[in-house]
Amino acid sequence: MTKYALVGDVGGTNARLALCDIASGEISQAKTYSGLDYPSLEAVVRVYLDEHSVNVEDGCIAIACPITGDWVAMTNHTWAFSIAEMKKNLGFSHLEIINDFTAVSMAIPMLKKEHLIQFGGGEPVDGKPIAVYGAGTGLGVAHLVHVDKRWISLPGEGGHVDFAPNSEEEAMILEILRAEIGHVSAERVLSGPGLVNLYRAIVKSDNRLPENLRPKDITERALADSCIDCRRALSLFCVIMGRFGGDLALTMGTFGGVYIAGGIVPRFLEFFKASGFRGGFEDKGRFKDYVHGIPVYLIVHDNPGLLGSGAHLRQTLGHIL
């Protein structure tokens, strides 16, 4: 008889839950719930389990916030809870709450070739470190290493490192944003809101007044080639995305590959392919040759967070991935 575990991927807006076959890692019965409709994460889990008439003893839920102890307070939501108390209330034997990019990194060993699009470089080197990052509401970063038949995710808040301009234009953008918001992290330019920041700074650098645009508006106008400022912002986004990925590659020697996740890049895939992304990735001066062969992949799996939550839990329970 198939034994299932509960897996989840929770962001500031929605909670996506599913079942994971503990033996195979296969994900099924995925369903998305609006976080605004429920008073707590526990309430959502109970509704899901009732709807699917399934008894589970184990669970792993990825959440878009730092996980530093038993108490979890979501960054972009009002939900807050004790992991131990939630585990007890649900009657689970195991309940893991992990960072969302920990989950994405743990999905990488489970991905197949059809789940990836490669952007330059050669073949990944087995046993070498891996980096994963992605732009969405924010900028998530994690690394992954393989030690003694176990995958170990190294989470962090790499999206909040300093934005490092590498041209006169970018230096001007930094100056404008710094005057507005103070500290300018990489996330302030590599995210949905970051794309808006780039657009606004580009327009203001020319002493003009920017329109009140959403990330979606900027992308659509850039792809339609109907707004030169929007197109420049999206082009710059791709280049900076490349340089940031190259920074991750240098920091950990990620000859196992660099992986891009998140919901933004797939929305303009053809534009991204033709952009200066790879040039930005390899623009490392004396260390260009060092990163030249490192492959970069875009993850196109529908639910890497759920897949990785399942992989993390299965490994915790003693399975070899």
From Swiss-Prot:
InterPro entries: ATPase_NBD, Bacterial_glucokinase, Glucokinase. ATP binds at residues 8-13. Its EC number is 2.7.1.2. GO terms for cellular component: cytosol. It is found in: Cytoplasm. GO terms for biological process: glycolytic process. Its main location: cytoplasm. The keyword Transferase applies. The keyword Cytoplasm applies. It is an enzyme of class 2 (transferase). It comes from the Bacteria. Keywords: ATP-binding, Cytoplasm, Glycolysis, Kinase, Nucleotide-binding, Transferase. Transmembrane segments: none annotated. It holds the Pfam family Glucokinase. Belongs to the bacterial glucokinase family. NCBIfam families: glk, PRK00292.1-1, PRK00292.1-3. This is Glucokinase. It comes from Salmonella schwarzengrund (strain CVM19633). The lineage of its organism: Bacteria, Pseudomonadati, Pseudomonadota, Gammaproteobacteria, Enterobacterales. The gene is glk.
